[in-house]
Design a protein with these regions (language model features):
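Divalent metal-binding pocket/active-site signature
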Residues: 104-163
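Divalent-metal coordination cores built from histidine and acidic residues
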Residues: 1-105, 134-135, 209
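Active-site neighborhoods of metal-dependent hydrolases
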Residues: 54, 58-75, 82-85, 94-112, ...
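Glycine- and other small-residue-rich loops at beta-strand/loop junctions that grip anionic moieties
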Residues: 39, 115, 156, 189-190
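Generic hydrophobic alpha-helical membrane-span motif
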Residues: 10-11, 108, 146, 220
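Short low-complexity, flexible loop/linker segments enriched in glycine and/or proline
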Residues: 23-28, 32, 79, 121-124, ...
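Amphipathic, non-transmembrane alpha-helical secondary structure
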Residues: 3, 48, 85-96, 100, ...
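Short gly/pro/ser/thr-enriched loop/turn and capping motifs at secondary-structure boundaries
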Residues: 16-20, 145, 219-221
Length: 274
């Protein structure tokens, strides 16, 4: 990478980091399972020690977020199961420890498990932590398209704009710095949302809340198959997903979504299967 002129990398995006989680958590093996495979046997879960390791093993500058999804899933798994007060506080403590020891902020992946199940109050708590340490809260938004599986209603305000509304609300409520990772417009039906998306994000800067976004430098993106699956389906245990009426409902929803999205399976290339 250095030979190409790359001197700095930013990692830990979209709610997932390779460190900072609870190594004794019951669900360590679920970390990143929708997006990547974490080898917990060779990982360094302590955020401070991980940073110290990097200082001596790479010529690159590395800026990393602490992934809310990694920490949360190590403690509570990938399901919608409500966290106990003790587990919730443990999650906040681990996130705060990372912020105290070099994390540039907290990243959330609201399109991925467990982020899709997180309510507004939890997001406010994350924003308050970032504000406390003058760090950034980075969002993989709930939707990057006009319609998505992130919201129940397929009609009305485009889902992409609803997702940015949520980000703006958290910024205004907590006052933390905001990074929208990534501002993309999936499907031709979403292209009409460009101007309003920019206006919404600029409104935070106008109110004195530092806000930025990044974009892909190429006309494609990489994600996981779960982003086209609705939340109600992902909540189901595996043994119920093959039931006839479950598959029928899923097929109907995906068919309607494709028509409204301007995006189809022909636009998807499967890179690998775990």
């Amino acid at each position: 990478m250095v030979g190409q002129g790359i001197t700095t990398v930013v990692t830990g995006n979209c709610g997932f980091s390779a460190t900072g989680y609870d190594p004794k958590g019951k669900y360590v093996d679920t970390i990143g399972s929708d997006s990547f495979a974490l080898d917990s046997k060779h990982a360094i879960p302590d955020f401070k020690k991980w940073i110290e390791y990097l200082d001596h093993h790479t010529p690159l500058n590395v800026a990393t977020y602490i992934g809310h999804g990694s920490v949360r899933s190590s403690i509570n798994g990938l399901t919608k199961k409500e966290m106990t007060k003790e587990d919730y506080q443990k999650m906040l403590d681990l996130l705060e420890y990372a912020l105290q020891n070099g994390a540039v902020g907290i990243s959330v992946g609201l399109m991925y498990r467990p982020g899709i199940f997180v309510d507004k109050e939890e997001l406010y708590d994350l924003g308050k932590l970032c504000k406390k340490y003058n760090k950034t809260m980075a969002f993989h938004a709930r939707a990057n398209s006009a319609v998505s599986m992130g919201y129940k209603s397929l009609l009305g305000r485009p889902h992409l704009l609803r997702a940015i509304d949520e980000i703006v609300d958290i910024g205004k409520t907590t006052g933390c710095k905001i990074q929208n990772s990534h501002l993309i417009f999936v499907g031709t039906k979403s292209w009409k949302c460009v101007d309003e998306s920019l206006k919404l994000l600029h409104s935070l800067n106008d109110e004195g809340i530092p806000t930025a976004f990044d974009m892909y430098s190429y006309p494609l993106g990489a994600s996981t198959i779960t982003v086209i699956l609705p939340k109600w389906y992902q909540r189901l245990p595996l043994q119920k997903r093959n039931r006839f009426f479950v598959k029928l409902r899923l097929s109907i929803e995906i068919f309607i979504t494709k028509k409204l999205l301007g995006f189809d399976f022909d636009d998807i290339q499967i890179a690998y299967v775990q």
